[in-house]
């Protein structure tokens, strides 16, 4: 999976970026596809993989989360529950006759209490998932050809108390490093933040 996806937690939000590359073998279709899908107002998933399975998987997850929210009378589904559902879907597909979903994902979310009596753990969360059904909550993570370079940068430069400006600057450095190091086109990155007020597009990262 050539496209690079990057995510990390900051002081009170999560930042996620994904390369806009959409290609069929050696043919580039577009450089500006948004691969960060909004599952709801406080959760996004950055998904890399083949076009058909990727689109099918994220739509399947999004629709099931909407159904579960309706069954819960409008109560927001937690990020951990969403990650568990995604992991179960990936692991189940791996063992089915239909075959696996060849996708790698970063799930970012910010859990907010539904009421004063709500005991759900609030705050920013980032989960790493791969096509084999691996699931782990991480402070930062990445997929794709640029992952080794970005991981090295984040090992050295990431801090849990990054401010909004520092987080955006670090994400831009990561994107620039991928563009410099990786031969496969990752010229355009789309970036989104998930703070307590809901998903926002970060225009200053590209």
UniProtKB/Swiss-Prot annotation:
GO CC, any one term: cytoplasm
Keywords annotated in UniProt: Cytoplasm, Nucleus, Proteasome
Record-stated family: Belongs to the peptidase T1B family.
Protein location: Cytoplasm; Nucleus
InterPro entries from the UniProt entry: Ntn_hydrolases_N (IPR029055), Proteasome_beta2 (IPR035206), Proteasome_sua/b (IPR001353), Proteasome_suB-type (IPR023333)
Keyword Iron assigned: no
Organism: Trypanosoma brucei brucei
Gene Ontology biological process: proteasomal protein catabolic process; ubiquitin-dependent protein catabolic process
Job of this protein: Non-catalytic component of the proteasome, a multicatalytic proteinase complex which is characterized by its ability to cleave peptides with Arg, Phe, Tyr, Leu, and Glu adjacent to the leaving group at neutral or slightly basic pH. The proteasome has an ATP-dependent proteolytic activity.
Protein name: Proteasome subunit beta type-2
Quaternary structure and partners: The 26S proteasome consists of a 20S proteasome core and two 19S regulatory subunits. The 20S proteasome core is composed of 28 subunits that are arranged in four stacked rings, resulting in a barrel-shaped structure. The two end rings are each formed by seven alpha subunits, and the two central rings are each formed by seven beta subunits. The catalytic chamber with the active sites is on the inside of the barrel.
A family per Pfam: Proteasome
GO MF assignments: endopeptidase activity
UniProt key word Nucleus: yes
């Amino acid at each position: 999976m050539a496209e690079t996806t990057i995510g990390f937690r900051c002081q009170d939000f999560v930042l996620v970026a994904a390369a806009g590359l959409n290609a069929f073998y050696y043919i580039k279709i577009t450089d500006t596809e948004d691969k960060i899908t909004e599952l709801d107002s406080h959760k996004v998933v950055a998904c890399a993989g083949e076009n058909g399975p990727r689109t099918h998987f994220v739509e399947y997850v999004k629709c099931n989360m909407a159904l579960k929210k309706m069954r819960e009378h409008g109560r927001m589904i937690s990020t951990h529950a969403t990650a568990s559902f995604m992991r179960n879907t990936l692991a189940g597909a791996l063992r089915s006759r239909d075959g696996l979903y060849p996708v790698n994902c970063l799930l970012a979310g910010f859990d907010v209490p539904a009421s004063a009596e709500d005991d759900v753990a609030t705050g920013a969360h980032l989960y790493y998932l791969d096509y084999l059904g691996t699931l782990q909550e991480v402070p930062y993570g990445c997929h794709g050809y640029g992952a080794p370079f970005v991981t090295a940068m984040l090992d050295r430069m990431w801090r849990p108390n990054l401010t909004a400006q520092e987080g955006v600057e670090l994400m831009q450095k990561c994107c620039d490093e991928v563009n410099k190091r990786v031969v496969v086109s990752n010229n355009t990155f789309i970036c989104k933040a998930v703070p307590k007020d809901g998903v926002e597009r970060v225009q200053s990262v590209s």
